[in-house]
């Protein structure tokens, strides 16, 4: 079995590669990654010498490079993690999101048509559903929830999902899609809420919280997410969408306060900044379908997962300190410096 994992040097993609190489040592895993700001080759250092792993630096929008890889490796399965994924960046510069999230997906679809595969899996997001009101805790996103996007990022992800399903219906490509809630865990790029707060708190820097911090997210430990995708690509029904949620709804401000408590830092570090444009209020996923059909359930409670995550960042400071000392620092100042 040969699997191409696009975006495999990023947060979720790298964790998926670790999971697959450990669980299926006989599989050949190919990582295709452009190595943008969020793709860090040092993340994959532990598997670089594995004879069943190969890294290829290329852009999924580069049709020639993608076709060449398909010709060389004859993959059975494609798992597409490659995407620009930060909402704030999509608001500042939406153009690059169109390129990677839609054009890149189209190139992969065409490669699958041309060379043939047994499964193409698109990793998507619950953000394609829009948001839910804070005063309706009884409401959850299901696979039947209409697409109702709020940001350029979620719009382009939704467009990619629709494209994947169109290729399934038109050309018969064997596809599946998963839509997950907010992930957290090791190797999470420090522009996202949890790693950003951990890094800033450790440096006794301000902890920027949008608005009043009352926005609610459902948190999914990245290892649980990887196990769900593993199940879908092996046992999921072709042409289906599967929601993957963690049953861990938390307000942003409560997460930040919890991180302060775990690190022994004062809540006075919390700084409220101007809210994000079009900030979604609440995300909450109903994962009943994947549980009933594939037997998946999240294993990690947030209280345990956040402790493991903080421990990882404490033990791997060089990984994230190297990141925030470079180009990311310029972006950080742009986003939070004058708020």
Annotated model-derived regions:
Residues 12, 38-39, 64, 188, ...:
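Residues that form or flank phosphate/diphosphate-binding pockets in enzymes
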Residues 41-44, 132-135, 188-191, 255-256, ...:
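Short aromatic-enriched loop/helix-cap "lid" or pocket-rim segments at secondary-structure transitions
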Residues 3, 19, 29, 58, ...:
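C-terminal substrate-binding subdomain of Rossmann-fold SDR/epimerase-dehydratase oxidoreductases
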Residues 1-183, 308, 313-316, 322, ...:
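N-terminal Rossmann-like NAD(P)+-binding domain of SDR-like oxidoreductases, especially those catalyzing
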Residues 137, 149-156, 186, 190-194, ...:
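The catalytic Tyr-centered alpha-helix of NAD(P)H-dependent dehydrogenases
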Residues 47, 135-136, 190-198, 274:
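A glycine/serine/threonine-rich, flexible loop-to-helix segment
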Residues 159, 163, 167, 197, ...:
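Hydrophobic alpha-helix immediately C-terminal to the catalytic Tyr-X-X-X-Lys motif of short-chain
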Residues 35, 182-185, 215-216, 276-277:
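Short histidine/acidic/glycine/proline-rich micro-motifs that form metal-
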């Amino acid at each position: 079995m040969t699997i191409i994992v696009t975006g495999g040097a990023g947060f979720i993609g790298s964790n998926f590669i670790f999971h697959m190489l450990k669980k299926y040592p006989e599989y050949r895993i190919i990582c295709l990654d452009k190595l943008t700001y969020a793709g860090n080759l040092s993340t994959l250092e532990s598997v670089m010498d594995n004879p069943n792993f190969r890294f290829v630096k290329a852009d999924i929008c580069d049709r020639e490079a993608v076709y060449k890889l398909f010709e060389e490796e004859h993959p059975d399965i494609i798992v597409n993690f490659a995407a620009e994924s930060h909402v704030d960046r999509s608001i500042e510069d939406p153009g690059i999101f169109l390129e990677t999230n839609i054009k890149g997906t189209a190139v992969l679809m065409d490669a699958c048509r041309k060379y043939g595969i047994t499964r193409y899996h698109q990793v998507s997001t619950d953000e394609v559903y829009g948001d839910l009101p804070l005063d309706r805790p009884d409401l959850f996103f299901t696979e039947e929830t209409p697409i109702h996007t709020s940001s350029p990022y979620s719009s382009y992800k939704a467009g990619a999902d629709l494209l994947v399903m169109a290729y399934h219906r038109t050309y018969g490509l064997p596809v599946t899609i998963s839509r997950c809630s907010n992930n957290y865990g090791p190797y999470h790029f420090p522009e996202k809420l949890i790693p950003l707060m951990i890094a800033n708190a450790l440096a006794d820097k301000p902890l920027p919280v949008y608005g009043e911090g009352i926005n609610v997210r459902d948190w999914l430990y990245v290892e649980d997410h990887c196990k769900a995708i593993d199940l879908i690509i092996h046992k999921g029904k072709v042409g289906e969408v599967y929601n993957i949620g963690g049953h861990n709804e938390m307000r942003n401000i409560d997460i930040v306060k919890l991180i302060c408590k775990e690190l022994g830092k004062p809540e006075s570090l919390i700084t409220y900044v101007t809210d994000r444009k079009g900030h979604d209020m609440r995300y909450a996923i109903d994962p009943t379908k994947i549980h009933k059909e594939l037997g998946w359930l999240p294993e990690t409670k947030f209280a345990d997962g956040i402790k493991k995550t903080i421990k990882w960042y404490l033990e791997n400071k060089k990984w994230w300190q190297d990141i925030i000392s470079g180009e990311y620092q310029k972006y950080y100042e742009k986003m939070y410096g004058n708020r």
